Amino acid sequence: MKKNIVFCFFAVAILSSLFADHDIILAPSVGYTYTNAFTVKNPINPSSENIDYFKAHNGYLEFTVGVILDNGFTYIEDAGFAAGPAYVTDSQMRVPSFFFISRSLLGYTFKPTQNLYINLLTGLGLTLGYPQVLQVGMPVNIGLFCFFNKKSGLNITATDMVGIGFPSFLTNAFTVKIGPIFRL
């Protein structure tokens, strides 16, 4: 029992010293996401007649939580919902679409001034939704956080996630968002 207490004490001490100088950020945001994908119906003959294209233009609501360390290392988790029309170009069908998008991002934050942060992040992303069922990809994120005081500011972010989907083959999801940001 004493070993567990000592281990927990040292684990808390090490973690608290690791994250001693950091910013925890919370950022709800709204934006736009464009998702496209294509599926080759006949892999033996990949002509343009054998390819289904899917395009979705969606409104987007997202919530972001992250840690920005004093040395610039950044870890961000974000999750959002998108809804809007989707188009299947071969049959020219318009269908409703909705997606859940989640990303885990690591990278670096440049701090040119005390209240201006520029993020360059990458990681792993997942999209679940209708009519495209699943996308697993690698997002690239560029963000600008401009704080007006010690605790609040403006978040402007663009993310592009290229990946492999099911039932689609290659997929791409581009998102632009804006919203308030809070620094704890």
Name every feature range the model reports, one short phrase each.
Residues 31, 99-105, 117, 159, ...:
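Detector for outer-membrane/organellar transmembrane beta-barrel domains
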